[in-house]
A protein has these predicted regions:
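Transmembrane alpha-helices and adjacent helix-loop boundaries
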Residues: 128-135
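Hydrophobic alpha-helical transmembrane segments of multipass integral membrane proteins
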Residues: 48, 84, 88-100, 104, ...
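Interhelical loop and adjacent transmembrane-helix boundary motif
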Residues: 31-35, 68-73, 77-78, 232-289, ...
Length: 322
């Protein structure tokens, strides 16, 4: 077993990896005239549609030097406010979706009740509705001409064209991410461990923190990462409910669009590069989480195999690392 919790079979088990049905063997059996065009096509598509545009964003942002880049990002008060607002709206929306996602996943996987299937369908509704339509729904509900707008306005509460509206719209469009990651995991886990914890005297909170949460942690973190990435880049719904007021309700995506409309290309590319950087950080975090989850799962399977006698301990190399 390696020091970081992973394990690999030694050379004695190596022939097993070269079986006829393994992916490596199938890959080697594919003709060269099939492999090369497919690989080149995949690389070309990724390069032209992803790598080149992303690289161009950073090139355009830094084309006039780092001093101009810094000025465009942090010396413009409207841009500073857009960055600040984005860094407020995204975490708050993620926190709300974590609470909702855990509650929804728990209700769907631990209880059977009338309308359960309908609830699962409703969780996916934000994926099907256009973000612009979602924003319009909140305007019609909470705007000054909406159903609840006059009542809220008479009590000094403003939702549309203010921070609460931005959070509400962002939370809506990112609603399914956490719940959709947790539901299949919690269904697969079942309730045996939780029932055992309760039978040993644990209360509900102890059961959740010590049994349920450790089992769903990777799915929860994965959902949080996806939710945060979407929240920071949301444009359509936020555009409708924000009023597009510079220095007040503009988030970073809205600021990019406004600077571009004003022919301030260096400024728009600077803000776009910051958004892209945040997206790349999110991608790296996603890859890291997937690797950690895969290693943890593999370690558990190997340990279970050794305990069951299916894998001889001598086939586990204590020094080899992945």
């Amino acid at each position: 077993m390696s020091v970081n919790g992973s394990a690999r079979p030694t050379s004695e088990a190596a022939p097993a990896a070269a079986t006829a049905g393994s992916p490596e063997r199938r890959y080697r059996q594919d003709p060269l005239w099939i492999r090369v065009p497919l690989i080149l096509t995949g690389v070309a598509i990724v390069g032209l549609l992803i790598v080149v545009p992303v690289a161009n964003v950073f090139y355009q942002a830094l084309a006039r030097g780092f001093g101009t880049y810094w000025h465009n990002l942090f010396d413009d008060p409207d841009t500073r406010q857009a960055i600040k607002l984005t860094l407020i709206v995204a975490p708050v929306s993620v926190a709300l979706n974590v609470s909702f996602g855990i509650a929804a996943a728990w209700a769907v996987t631990r209880f059977r009740f009338p309308g359960r299937t309908f609830l699962v369908t409703l969780i996916d509704l934000p994926f099907a509705i256009s973000p612009v339509v979602a924003g319009l729904m909140f305007v019609l509900l909470f705007g000054l001409q909406g159903y609840l707008g006059p009542w809220l306005h008479s009590r000094g509460v403003q939702i549309i064209f203010a921070l609460p509206g931005l959070i509400l719209a962002t939370t809506f469009v990112t609603l399914p991410f956490v719940a959709r990651e947790l539901i299949p995991v919690m269904e697969a886990l079942g309730t045996d461990e939780e029932a055992a914890a309760l039978s040993l005297g644990a209360d509900g909170w102890q059961m959740f923190w010590r049994v349920t949460l450790p089992n769903i942690k990777w799915a929860l973190l994965y959902g949080v990462i996806l939710c945060n990435a979407r929240a920071m880049g949301e444009f359509g719904a936020v555009y409708v409910v924000s009023g597009h007021i510079a220095g007040q309700t503009d988030t970073m995506p809205l600021r990019v669009q406004k600077l571009f409309d004003e022919y301030n290309n260096p400024g728009s590319f600077a803000v776009a590069s910051l958004l892209t950087s945040l997206a790349l950080v999110t991608l790296l975090a996603k890859v890291w989480l997937e690797r950690k989850a895969r290693l943890e799962r593999k370690t558990g399977e190997l340990a279970a195999g050794v305990l069951a006698g299916a894998i001889p301990p001598r086939l586990i190399d204590p020094l080899e690392t992945p």
